[in-house]
Amino acid sequence: GILVEDLLTLADRGEEVMVEGNAYDPVALLTLFVKRSLGLLGMHVPMAKIEAIMFTVEDLTPRMVDVLLRVAGGLSLEKANVSFQNHLESFYAYTLHQNKELYQNDVVVYEYNSALKMMCLSCNEHTTPKVVLIGQQEYEQMLRRVWSTEEETCKSQKEDLDELFDGIIKESLADRQVSTVFLIGDGFKEDWARESLRTLCRGRRVFQGNNLYSKGACYGMLERLSPSEKWKQYVYLGEDKLKSNVGMRALRNGQEAYFAVLDAGSSWYETSADYEVILESGDTVEFIITPLTGGKVMDRKVQLTGIPQRPRAATRLSVHLEMTSVNQANVTIEDLGFGELFPSSGKAWSSTITI
């Protein structure tokens, strides 16, 4: 057989894979790989009984979302049962499923594969819901080492790496209250961390392993299917999450009220809304953007140019919102008229709003 590595990267780049002179679609090969991997579970869980599946990858770019949707489509699983989240959200989901004492303060992950990467989860307990943020820092100076075959040289290399990591720990954690640290990645399996581990373990809980993201993906899927009471108390504002609530002012029982359309904390690539409203007057539809990060509340207006003039509250509108990126949404509005008295004009308006 021919070994093909880095299928996910190849699929993300859209590069054809050459095998014995034949060109193959990398997404098709990735789909086959996932299907065969799921097939290994066949003795325990037949694919027909899989209720939901979560993919977790390092970065969920629009291109990667498209790749994963194509993979999911090739698995003969219902799209509604397939979700995606990046590694940071898997870290968040994993953390929230630990004992509270482990995330009483900040939680840090050091990931060491090609180069060292640090992620720090912090929570603002004074908001409702509680807002969770995750910061990232890369340390290119701590690249994976190629160990010498000569014993003394190898020992010296490991001591140097240990000293380098020890310095990074002291610098990166100097101004933080950290409850727990997770060490993940193959680089930590190479038996070089001595003094750095002693530094790390002073006043902190430290764990090492390689299944944090996969377990976090499972926890994340469970919460999407049936959110726990604890989960509802938090909102994670990651890079691919809406940072603001989107709503409209509406009349309910004669009183002005807020009508929620999109919720902050939702993944942009899974976020859309469809609903109908009655336009009371005028020729604009207005959306209210409320940042959870404490910024100024903003209004976004969509102009309904050429909408038929009708009596007050005699125009029914169909509204569709769909996120196209983390801070932009496409809005499509259609005139539905108002029964037999005022038939639909067939007009529709499209606009892009910034959130």
Model region roles, listed by residue range:
Residues 219-306, 316:
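Acidic, glycine/GT-rich loop-and beta-edge segments that sit at the periphery of enzyme/chaperone cores
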Residues 28-96, 210:
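Active-site neighborhood for divalent-cation/phosphate handling
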Residues 1, 95-138, 315-336:
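Gly/Thr-rich phosphate-binding beta-strand-loop-beta motif of the actin/hexokinase/Hsp70
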Residues 1-16, 73, 81-85, 90-93, ...:
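Early-domain small/polar-rich strand-loop-helix modules and first-structured segments
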Residues 1-56, 142-166:
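Conserved phosphate-binding loops in N-terminal lobes of ATP-dependent enzymes
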Residues 53-65, 168-198, 209:
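Glycine-rich phosphate-binding loops at beta-strand->alpha-helix junctions
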Residues 1-3, 122-158, 341-355:
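Short glycine-rich, Thr/Ser-proximal phosphate-binding strand/loop in the N-terminal lobe
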Residues 77-109, 212-230, 311:
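Conserved phosphate-binding catalytic cores of ATP/NTP-utilizing and phosphoryl-transfer enzymes
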